[in-house]
């Protein structure tokens, strides 16, 4: 690839926690809850068949960012091998002059995502601590915390958007959502939208 004319466009990877195909209308005969994703899929290259090299989130991050499939019972991130040197999309793009970042709105240190991301070359990591104690005061609201995992995805996506607007280009950034993880805490502002028969978390 070094001999090719490399166009330095911004690259964003969005990893959606627990978003099964049954929730995506474009993959479920129009029955779903993701109209925006459905609209993107109409103008995108979509792979309807895929091979997963891990079963859990802790296995997905090494697989997606560093092409490291799951070989062991113990996840790579929490194993002794986590201290090895790895090439990753971040480290390779850093060499091309990219600014790299990883966003996951949970407590820093959860599943060692932050330390792994730094190990494989992500220059910046943004989690719950950066959200509450970072540069934007408007994001320092306790009601944005779901009481279990971290920041609600809606608010963390807004935070991410504000970050990308000010980011140095070209950039490579990965966003890993969290809210769809059990126990599926519904924000107060949305609790009365669903009738009892249609509550998604029951």
Model regions: which residues?
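Solvent-exposed soluble domains appended to multi-pass membrane proteins
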Residues: 1-202
